[in-house]
Amino acid sequence: MMAQTGYGCVTALYDCRSKQEYIYRTNRIREISGGSELLANVYGMFFRAAGKKGLRINSDWRSGAEFSVKAFAESGFDGEVIYEGGGNLFIMYKSRETYIRANRIFSRMLLEKTYTISVIAACVETTDNFKEDRTRLYKENSRIKSTDWISVPCNTLPITQVDRDTFMPIVKKEDNCSLSRESMLKRKAFEKSAEVGEMFLDDISGEENKGTESLLAVIYVDGNAMSKKVKACTENISGYTECTSALRRFSISADKSFVERPISAIKAKLAERTDGRHKFRRVIAGGDEITLICNARAALDVVTAYFSALDEENRSLPDDQKNYACAGIAIAHSHAPFSDVYEIAEQCCESGKKKSRAQDSRVNYVDFHFCRSGITNDMETIRETQEAGLTARPYEVSAELSGFISAGQRLSAIGRANIKDLAAAMIKGDSCYRFEVERIKSRYPAAGLDSGDEKLRKLIFDIAQVYDIWFAKTETDEQEASE
Protein backbone atom coordinates (compact mmCIF):
# COMPACT_ATOMS: atom_id res chain seq x y z
CA MET A 1 0.00 0.00 0.00
CA MET A 2 1.31 3.45 -0.90
CA ALA A 3 2.23 5.72 1.98
CA GLN A 4 -0.14 8.69 1.86
CA THR A 5 2.16 11.38 3.21
CA GLY A 6 1.55 13.95 0.50
CA TYR A 7 -0.39 16.40 2.69
CA GLY A 8 -3.41 16.08 0.38
CA CYS A 9 -1.42 17.35 -2.62
CA VAL A 10 -1.56 16.00 -6.17
CA THR A 11 1.28 15.69 -8.67
CA ALA A 12 0.42 16.57 -12.27
CA LEU A 13 2.06 16.03 -15.63
CA TYR A 14 1.41 18.24 -18.66
CA ASP A 15 2.53 17.01 -22.05
CA CYS A 16 2.28 18.98 -25.32
CA ARG A 17 1.39 16.51 -28.04
CA SER A 18 1.65 16.76 -31.82
CA LYS A 19 4.07 19.68 -31.51
CA GLN A 20 5.53 19.26 -34.97
CA GLU A 21 2.07 18.97 -36.51
CA TYR A 22 1.05 22.27 -34.89
CA ILE A 23 4.13 24.03 -36.25
CA TYR A 24 4.29 22.52 -39.72
CA ARG A 25 0.64 22.11 -40.68
CA THR A 26 1.03 25.36 -42.61
CA ASN A 27 3.58 26.09 -45.30
CA ARG A 28 3.68 29.82 -44.56
CA ILE A 29 7.06 30.58 -43.10
CA ARG A 30 5.88 33.33 -40.73
CA GLU A 31 3.26 31.03 -39.26
CA ILE A 32 5.83 28.28 -38.75
CA SER A 33 7.97 30.77 -36.84
CA GLY A 34 4.99 32.00 -34.80
CA GLY A 35 3.88 28.46 -34.00
CA SER A 36 7.32 27.61 -32.66
CA GLU A 37 7.26 30.74 -30.48
CA LEU A 38 3.87 29.81 -29.02
CA LEU A 39 5.01 26.27 -28.21
CA ALA A 40 8.24 27.49 -26.64
CA ASN A 41 6.35 29.82 -24.32
CA VAL A 42 3.14 27.85 -23.70
CA TYR A 43 3.88 26.99 -20.05
CA GLY A 44 5.03 30.52 -19.24
CA MET A 45 1.79 31.83 -20.76
CA PHE A 46 -0.09 29.40 -18.51
CA PHE A 47 1.66 30.64 -15.36
CA ARG A 48 0.87 34.27 -16.24
CA ALA A 49 -2.77 33.46 -17.00
CA ALA A 50 -3.08 31.58 -13.70
CA GLY A 51 -1.58 34.52 -11.81
CA LYS A 52 -4.14 36.90 -13.30
CA LYS A 53 -6.90 34.60 -12.01
CA GLY A 54 -5.46 34.57 -8.50
CA LEU A 55 -3.81 31.14 -8.75
CA ARG A 56 -0.26 31.40 -7.45
CA ILE A 57 2.21 28.99 -9.07
CA ASN A 58 5.87 29.02 -8.11
CA SER A 59 7.66 28.48 -11.43
CA ASP A 60 11.17 29.42 -10.24
CA TRP A 61 12.49 25.86 -10.32
CA ARG A 62 15.86 26.78 -11.84
CA SER A 63 16.97 28.89 -8.87
CA GLY A 64 18.59 25.95 -7.06
CA ALA A 65 16.23 26.10 -4.08
CA GLU A 66 15.48 22.72 -2.50
CA PHE A 67 12.00 21.32 -3.03
CA SER A 68 10.01 19.85 -0.15
CA VAL A 69 6.42 18.57 -0.17
CA LYS A 70 5.97 19.70 3.43
CA ALA A 71 7.37 23.18 2.73
CA PHE A 72 5.13 23.53 -0.33
CA ALA A 73 2.03 22.38 1.60
CA GLU A 74 2.71 25.06 4.21
CA SER A 75 3.55 27.80 1.68
CA GLY A 76 1.25 30.41 0.21
CA PHE A 77 1.51 28.94 -3.30
CA ASP A 78 -1.30 26.98 -4.93
CA GLY A 79 1.12 25.10 -7.16
CA GLU A 80 4.86 24.62 -7.64
CA VAL A 81 6.81 23.44 -10.66
CA ILE A 82 8.82 20.34 -9.87
CA TYR A 83 10.76 20.49 -13.12
CA GLU A 84 10.29 20.99 -16.84
CA GLY A 85 12.02 19.14 -19.63
CA GLY A 86 11.49 17.69 -23.10
CA GLY A 87 8.12 19.40 -23.50
CA ASN A 88 6.84 17.93 -20.23
CA LEU A 89 5.90 19.91 -17.13
CA PHE A 90 5.73 18.30 -13.69
CA ILE A 91 3.86 20.40 -11.17
CA MET A 92 2.41 19.88 -7.69
CA TYR A 93 -0.92 21.34 -6.58
CA LYS A 94 -2.31 21.58 -3.06
CA SER A 95 -5.46 19.70 -3.98
CA ARG A 96 -7.28 18.05 -6.85
CA GLU A 97 -9.73 20.97 -6.86
CA THR A 98 -6.81 23.35 -7.45
CA TYR A 99 -5.60 21.10 -10.29
CA ILE A 100 -9.04 21.23 -11.93
CA ARG A 101 -9.19 25.00 -11.54
CA ALA A 102 -5.73 25.36 -13.08
CA ASN A 103 -6.73 23.16 -16.01
CA ARG A 104 -9.74 25.34 -16.73
CA ILE A 105 -7.49 28.40 -16.84
CA PHE A 106 -4.95 26.55 -18.99
CA SER A 107 -7.61 25.29 -21.43
CA ARG A 108 -9.08 28.76 -21.92
CA MET A 109 -5.63 30.26 -22.39
CA LEU A 110 -4.75 27.63 -25.01
CA LEU A 111 -7.94 28.37 -26.92
CA GLU A 112 -7.55 32.15 -26.78
CA LYS A 113 -3.79 32.43 -27.33
CA THR A 114 -2.89 29.41 -29.48
CA TYR A 115 -6.26 28.05 -30.66
CA THR A 116 -5.16 24.45 -31.31
CA ILE A 117 -2.13 23.51 -29.18
CA SER A 118 -3.08 20.20 -27.57
CA VAL A 119 -1.92 19.48 -24.02
CA ILE A 120 -2.51 16.22 -22.15
CA ALA A 121 -2.99 16.63 -18.40
CA ALA A 122 -2.74 13.81 -15.88
CA CYS A 123 -2.53 13.79 -12.10
CA VAL A 124 -2.11 11.34 -9.21
CA GLU A 125 -2.29 11.70 -5.45
CA THR A 126 1.09 12.62 -4.01
CA THR A 127 2.83 10.00 -1.87
CA ASP A 128 6.27 9.93 -0.30
CA ASN A 129 7.71 8.08 -3.32
CA PHE A 130 8.33 10.32 -6.32
CA LYS A 131 9.42 7.49 -8.64
CA GLU A 132 6.20 5.55 -8.06
CA ASP A 133 4.13 8.70 -8.57
CA ARG A 134 5.99 9.45 -11.81
CA THR A 135 5.42 5.90 -13.07
CA ARG A 136 1.69 6.22 -12.38
CA LEU A 137 1.64 9.59 -14.15
CA TYR A 138 3.31 8.15 -17.24
CA LYS A 139 0.79 5.29 -17.32
CA GLU A 140 -2.12 7.71 -17.02
CA ASN A 141 -0.59 9.95 -19.69
CA SER A 142 -0.22 6.95 -22.01
CA ARG A 143 -3.82 5.89 -21.38
CA ILE A 144 -5.14 9.36 -22.20
CA LYS A 145 -3.03 9.56 -25.37
CA SER A 146 -4.42 6.29 -26.66
CA THR A 147 -8.08 6.92 -25.78
CA ASP A 148 -8.60 10.69 -25.88
CA TRP A 149 -10.23 12.48 -28.81
CA ILE A 150 -8.14 14.86 -30.90
CA SER A 151 -10.54 17.62 -31.83
CA VAL A 152 -10.43 21.11 -33.30
CA PRO A 153 -12.26 23.99 -31.62
CA CYS A 154 -14.64 24.80 -34.46
CA ASN A 155 -16.23 22.79 -37.22
CA THR A 156 -17.24 24.39 -40.49
CA LEU A 157 -20.52 24.76 -42.35
CA PRO A 158 -21.06 24.16 -46.09
CA ILE A 159 -21.14 27.91 -46.65
CA THR A 160 -17.88 28.55 -44.74
CA GLN A 161 -14.66 29.33 -46.54
CA VAL A 162 -11.91 27.11 -45.13
CA ASP A 163 -8.13 27.07 -45.05
CA ARG A 164 -6.89 24.71 -47.76
CA ASP A 165 -4.27 23.12 -45.47
CA THR A 166 -6.02 22.90 -42.09
CA PHE A 167 -9.71 23.06 -43.14
CA MET A 168 -10.33 25.58 -40.37
CA PRO A 169 -12.75 28.45 -41.04
CA ILE A 170 -11.31 31.60 -42.57
CA VAL A 171 -11.84 34.58 -40.26
CA LYS A 172 -9.72 37.29 -41.88
CA LYS A 173 -7.95 38.27 -45.09
CA GLU A 174 -4.58 39.96 -44.79
CA ASP A 175 -1.69 40.51 -47.24
CA ASN A 176 -3.60 38.58 -49.91
CA CYS A 177 -3.80 35.61 -47.53
CA SER A 178 -6.93 34.00 -46.11
CA LEU A 179 -6.30 33.39 -42.42
CA SER A 180 -7.87 31.11 -39.85
CA ARG A 181 -7.89 31.95 -36.16
CA GLU A 182 -4.85 29.72 -35.66
CA SER A 183 -2.98 31.47 -38.48
CA MET A 184 -3.73 34.89 -37.01
CA LEU A 185 -2.39 33.90 -33.58
CA LYS A 186 0.75 32.41 -35.09
CA ARG A 187 1.39 35.58 -37.11
CA LYS A 188 0.88 37.70 -34.02
CA ALA A 189 3.44 35.61 -32.12
CA PHE A 190 5.85 35.91 -35.05
CA GLU A 191 5.55 39.70 -35.10
CA LYS A 192 6.33 39.86 -31.38
CA SER A 193 9.41 37.66 -31.78
CA ALA A 194 10.58 39.70 -34.78
CA GLU A 195 10.45 42.83 -32.63
CA VAL A 196 13.12 41.36 -30.33
CA GLY A 197 15.48 40.48 -33.15
CA GLU A 198 14.55 36.94 -34.15
CA MET A 199 15.54 36.01 -37.70
CA PHE A 200 12.86 36.09 -40.40
CA LEU A 201 12.71 32.79 -42.22
CA ASP A 202 12.08 34.77 -45.40
CA ASP A 203 15.59 36.17 -44.94
CA ILE A 204 17.02 32.72 -44.21
CA SER A 205 15.72 31.17 -47.40
CA GLY A 206 16.93 34.06 -49.50
CA GLU A 207 13.52 35.11 -50.78
CA GLU A 208 15.15 38.10 -52.43
CA ASN A 209 16.95 35.60 -54.72
CA LYS A 210 13.97 33.37 -55.37
CA GLY A 211 14.75 30.62 -57.84
CA THR A 212 18.50 30.69 -57.18
CA GLU A 213 18.80 30.67 -53.41
CA SER A 214 15.53 29.35 -52.00
CA LEU A 215 16.88 26.12 -50.50
CA LEU A 216 16.26 25.53 -46.81
CA ALA A 217 17.52 22.82 -44.49
CA VAL A 218 15.52 21.44 -41.59
CA ILE A 219 17.92 20.07 -38.97
CA TYR A 220 16.62 17.78 -36.24
CA VAL A 221 18.95 16.83 -33.37
CA ASP A 222 18.02 14.43 -30.59
CA GLY A 223 20.05 13.16 -27.64
CA ASN A 224 21.04 9.51 -27.39
CA ALA A 225 19.65 7.24 -24.65
CA MET A 226 18.32 10.15 -22.60
CA SER A 227 15.51 8.11 -21.03
CA LYS A 228 18.16 5.83 -19.52
CA LYS A 229 19.99 8.85 -18.12
CA VAL A 230 16.80 10.26 -16.60
CA LYS A 231 16.16 6.91 -14.96
CA ALA A 232 19.77 6.64 -13.78
CA CYS A 233 19.80 10.02 -12.04
CA THR A 234 17.11 8.80 -9.60
CA GLU A 235 18.28 5.18 -9.45
CA ASN A 236 19.03 4.89 -5.73
CA ILE A 237 16.65 7.53 -4.38
CA SER A 238 12.87 7.82 -4.19
CA GLY A 239 11.90 10.81 -2.05
CA TYR A 240 10.54 14.00 -3.60
CA THR A 241 13.31 16.22 -2.25
CA GLU A 242 16.16 14.03 -3.51
CA CYS A 243 14.56 13.11 -6.84
CA THR A 244 13.43 16.65 -7.61
CA SER A 245 16.90 18.06 -6.91
CA ALA A 246 18.51 15.40 -9.12
CA LEU A 247 16.05 15.91 -11.98
CA ARG A 248 16.33 19.69 -11.83
CA ARG A 249 20.11 19.45 -12.06
CA PHE A 250 19.82 16.99 -14.92
CA SER A 251 17.29 19.11 -16.83
CA ILE A 252 19.38 22.28 -16.48
CA SER A 253 22.54 20.41 -17.48
CA ALA A 254 20.85 18.83 -20.52
CA ASP A 255 19.52 22.20 -21.68
CA LYS A 256 22.98 23.70 -21.31
CA SER A 257 24.72 20.85 -23.17
CA PHE A 258 22.18 20.27 -25.95
CA VAL A 259 20.79 23.77 -26.49
CA GLU A 260 22.49 26.77 -24.86
CA ARG A 261 26.15 26.06 -25.63
CA PRO A 262 25.57 24.65 -29.13
CA ILE A 263 23.33 27.58 -30.12
CA SER A 264 26.01 30.03 -28.96
CA ALA A 265 28.61 28.09 -30.94
CA ILE A 266 26.42 28.11 -34.06
CA LYS A 267 25.90 31.87 -33.80
CA ALA A 268 29.65 32.41 -33.43
CA LYS A 269 30.41 30.12 -36.38
CA LEU A 270 27.91 31.74 -38.72
CA ALA A 271 28.95 35.24 -37.67
CA GLU A 272 32.27 34.54 -39.40
CA ARG A 273 30.49 34.31 -42.75
CA THR A 274 29.82 37.47 -44.76
CA ASP A 275 27.65 36.14 -47.59
CA GLY A 276 24.32 36.78 -45.83
CA ARG A 277 23.20 33.22 -46.48
CA HIS A 278 24.40 31.71 -43.23
CA LYS A 279 21.40 32.37 -41.03
CA PHE A 280 19.23 30.11 -38.92
CA ARG A 281 16.24 30.04 -36.61
CA ARG A 282 15.33 27.73 -33.76
CA VAL A 283 11.97 26.06 -34.20
CA ILE A 284 11.98 23.86 -31.10
CA ALA A 285 14.74 23.82 -28.50
CA GLY A 286 14.34 22.17 -25.13
CA GLY A 287 15.89 19.34 -23.18
CA ASP A 288 17.87 17.09 -25.52
CA GLU A 289 15.84 17.93 -28.64
CA ILE A 290 16.38 20.79 -31.02
CA THR A 291 14.99 21.64 -34.46
CA LEU A 292 16.55 24.36 -36.60
CA ILE A 293 15.73 25.82 -40.00
CA CYS A 294 18.57 27.42 -41.91
CA ASN A 295 19.73 28.28 -45.39
CA ALA A 296 20.82 24.97 -46.93
CA ARG A 297 24.35 26.27 -47.53
CA ALA A 298 24.73 26.80 -43.78
CA ALA A 299 23.60 23.32 -42.73
CA LEU A 300 27.06 21.75 -42.63
CA ASP A 301 28.47 24.65 -40.60
CA VAL A 302 25.50 24.46 -38.22
CA VAL A 303 25.93 20.74 -37.58
CA THR A 304 29.71 20.82 -37.17
CA ALA A 305 29.45 23.78 -34.76
CA TYR A 306 26.74 21.96 -32.80
CA PHE A 307 28.77 18.80 -32.27
CA SER A 308 31.97 20.73 -31.55
CA ALA A 309 30.14 22.46 -28.69
CA LEU A 310 28.72 19.14 -27.47
CA ASP A 311 32.21 17.60 -27.45
CA GLU A 312 33.56 20.64 -25.62
CA GLU A 313 30.93 20.20 -22.90
CA ASN A 314 31.77 16.50 -22.59
CA ARG A 315 35.39 17.22 -21.72
CA SER A 316 34.37 18.45 -18.28
CA LEU A 317 32.03 15.51 -17.59
CA PRO A 318 32.82 12.01 -16.28
CA ASP A 319 32.45 9.19 -18.81
CA ASP A 320 29.09 8.00 -17.47
CA GLN A 321 27.63 11.52 -17.82
CA LYS A 322 28.88 12.44 -21.28
CA ASN A 323 26.19 13.45 -23.78
CA TYR A 324 25.80 12.15 -27.32
CA ALA A 325 23.31 12.95 -30.07
CA CYS A 326 22.35 12.25 -33.67
CA ALA A 327 21.33 14.80 -36.29
CA GLY A 328 19.21 14.56 -39.42
CA ILE A 329 19.37 17.15 -42.21
CA ALA A 330 16.60 17.42 -44.81
CA ILE A 331 17.23 19.87 -47.65
CA ALA A 332 14.34 21.16 -49.75
CA HIS A 333 13.04 24.22 -51.57
CA SER A 334 11.29 26.78 -49.39
CA HIS A 335 7.94 26.00 -51.03
CA ALA A 336 8.11 22.28 -50.12
CA PRO A 337 5.66 20.99 -47.47
CA PHE A 338 7.52 21.59 -44.22
CA SER A 339 5.76 18.78 -42.38
CA ASP A 340 7.10 16.28 -44.93
CA VAL A 341 10.59 17.80 -44.87
CA TYR A 342 10.65 17.63 -41.07
CA GLU A 343 9.68 13.95 -41.16
CA ILE A 344 12.60 13.23 -43.48
CA ALA A 345 14.94 15.08 -41.08
CA GLU A 346 13.58 13.05 -38.17
CA GLN A 347 14.01 9.80 -40.11
CA CYS A 348 17.59 10.76 -41.01
CA CYS A 349 18.24 11.30 -37.30
CA GLU A 350 16.76 7.89 -36.53
CA SER A 351 19.03 6.21 -39.09
CA GLY A 352 21.99 7.62 -37.16
CA LYS A 353 20.53 6.43 -33.88
CA LYS A 354 20.27 2.87 -35.23
CA LYS A 355 24.03 2.81 -35.82
CA SER A 356 24.73 4.56 -32.52
CA ARG A 357 22.71 1.99 -30.54
CA ALA A 358 25.06 -0.71 -31.76
CA GLN A 359 27.79 1.21 -29.91
CA ASP A 360 25.83 1.70 -26.69
CA SER A 361 24.54 5.08 -27.98
CA ARG A 362 27.90 6.67 -27.17
CA VAL A 363 28.68 7.91 -30.69
CA ASN A 364 27.38 10.97 -32.58
CA TYR A 365 26.03 10.44 -36.10
CA VAL A 366 24.79 12.72 -38.90
CA ASP A 367 22.62 11.78 -41.86
CA PHE A 368 21.24 13.99 -44.63
CA HIS A 369 18.92 13.85 -47.63
CA PHE A 370 18.20 16.26 -50.48
CA CYS A 371 14.45 16.28 -51.27
CA ARG A 372 14.72 17.24 -54.93
CA SER A 373 11.48 16.32 -56.66
CA GLY A 374 8.86 15.99 -53.97
CA ILE A 375 8.56 13.60 -51.04
CA THR A 376 6.65 10.46 -51.92
CA ASN A 377 8.27 7.85 -49.64
CA ASP A 378 9.78 7.53 -46.19
CA MET A 379 13.55 7.64 -45.75
CA GLU A 380 13.97 3.88 -45.35
CA THR A 381 12.13 3.18 -48.62
CA ILE A 382 14.16 5.82 -50.46
CA ARG A 383 17.41 4.25 -49.26
CA GLU A 384 16.33 0.73 -50.18
CA THR A 385 14.99 1.55 -53.65
CA GLN A 386 17.23 4.41 -54.81
CA GLU A 387 20.47 4.40 -52.82
CA ALA A 388 21.08 0.80 -51.72
CA GLY A 389 24.81 0.04 -51.83
CA LEU A 390 25.60 3.56 -53.04
CA THR A 391 25.66 5.72 -49.91
CA ALA A 392 27.90 5.77 -46.85
CA ARG A 393 25.37 7.69 -44.77
CA PRO A 394 24.96 8.12 -41.84
CA TYR A 395 28.39 9.49 -40.87
CA GLU A 396 30.02 9.25 -37.46
CA VAL A 397 30.78 12.86 -36.57
CA SER A 398 34.39 12.98 -35.39
CA ALA A 399 36.09 10.89 -38.10
CA GLU A 400 33.68 9.92 -40.89
CA LEU A 401 32.02 13.33 -41.30
CA SER A 402 35.42 15.02 -41.30
CA GLY A 403 36.53 12.55 -43.98
CA PHE A 404 33.42 13.33 -46.02
CA ILE A 405 34.09 17.08 -45.82
CA SER A 406 37.79 16.64 -46.69
CA ALA A 407 36.92 14.42 -49.65
CA GLY A 408 34.40 16.95 -50.92
CA GLN A 409 36.92 19.76 -50.73
CA ARG A 410 39.64 17.65 -52.38
CA LEU A 411 37.42 16.37 -55.19
CA SER A 412 36.23 19.87 -56.05
CA ALA A 413 39.48 20.06 -58.04
CA ILE A 414 38.03 17.72 -60.71
CA GLY A 415 35.01 19.99 -61.20
CA ARG A 416 31.28 19.73 -60.77
CA ALA A 417 30.55 17.99 -64.07
CA ASN A 418 32.97 15.14 -63.37
CA ILE A 419 31.61 14.56 -59.86
CA LYS A 420 28.07 14.41 -61.22
CA ASP A 421 29.19 12.06 -64.01
CA LEU A 422 30.77 9.70 -61.48
CA ALA A 423 27.57 9.54 -59.42
CA ALA A 424 25.46 8.92 -62.52
CA ALA A 425 27.85 6.17 -63.64
CA MET A 426 27.50 4.38 -60.29
CA ILE A 427 23.78 3.99 -60.88
CA LYS A 428 24.39 2.55 -64.37
CA GLY A 429 26.81 -0.10 -63.13
CA ASP A 430 30.39 -0.96 -62.18
CA SER A 431 31.77 -0.93 -65.73
CA CYS A 432 30.42 2.58 -66.36
CA TYR A 433 31.87 3.78 -63.07
CA ARG A 434 35.32 2.29 -63.79
CA PHE A 435 35.32 3.87 -67.24
CA GLU A 436 34.52 7.31 -65.78
CA VAL A 437 37.20 6.94 -63.10
CA GLU A 438 39.86 6.11 -65.69
CA ARG A 439 38.74 8.98 -67.92
CA ILE A 440 38.98 11.50 -65.09
CA LYS A 441 42.26 10.04 -63.76
CA SER A 442 43.86 10.68 -67.14
CA ARG A 443 43.09 14.38 -66.76
CA TYR A 444 43.46 14.73 -62.98
CA PRO A 445 46.09 12.20 -61.85
CA ALA A 446 46.52 13.97 -58.50
CA ALA A 447 42.83 13.58 -57.55
CA GLY A 448 43.47 10.21 -55.90
CA LEU A 449 40.65 8.36 -57.67
CA ASP A 450 40.61 4.56 -57.46
CA SER A 451 37.79 2.50 -58.96
CA GLY A 452 38.50 -0.30 -56.47
CA ASP A 453 38.13 1.92 -53.39
CA GLU A 454 34.59 1.14 -52.18
CA LYS A 455 34.73 3.71 -49.37
CA LEU A 456 35.71 6.49 -51.78
CA ARG A 457 33.01 5.36 -54.20
CA LYS A 458 30.28 5.88 -51.60
CA LEU A 459 31.79 9.19 -50.54
CA ILE A 460 31.68 10.43 -54.13
CA PHE A 461 28.00 9.47 -54.43
CA ASP A 462 27.12 11.39 -51.24
CA ILE A 463 29.25 14.38 -52.22
CA ALA A 464 27.46 14.56 -55.58
CA GLN A 465 24.08 14.84 -53.83
CA VAL A 466 25.05 18.07 -52.04
CA TYR A 467 28.02 19.32 -54.06
CA ASP A 468 26.34 22.47 -55.34
CA ILE A 469 25.28 23.45 -51.82
CA TRP A 470 28.25 22.58 -49.64
CA PHE A 471 31.35 22.25 -51.82
CA ALA A 472 31.00 24.30 -55.02
CA LYS A 473 32.95 27.52 -54.92
CA THR A 474 30.87 30.70 -54.82
CA GLU A 475 32.03 34.21 -55.59
CA THR A 476 31.88 35.01 -51.87
CA ASP A 477 34.01 31.97 -50.98
CA GLU A 478 36.66 33.00 -53.50
CA GLN A 479 36.63 36.57 -52.19
CA GLU A 480 37.01 35.42 -48.57
CA ALA A 481 39.81 33.02 -49.51
CA SER A 482 41.76 35.85 -51.17
CA GLU A 483 41.47 38.19 -48.17
Q: In which residue ranges do the predicted regions lie?
A:
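Regulatory and interdomain segments flanking nucleotide-handling catalytic cores
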Residues: 1-483
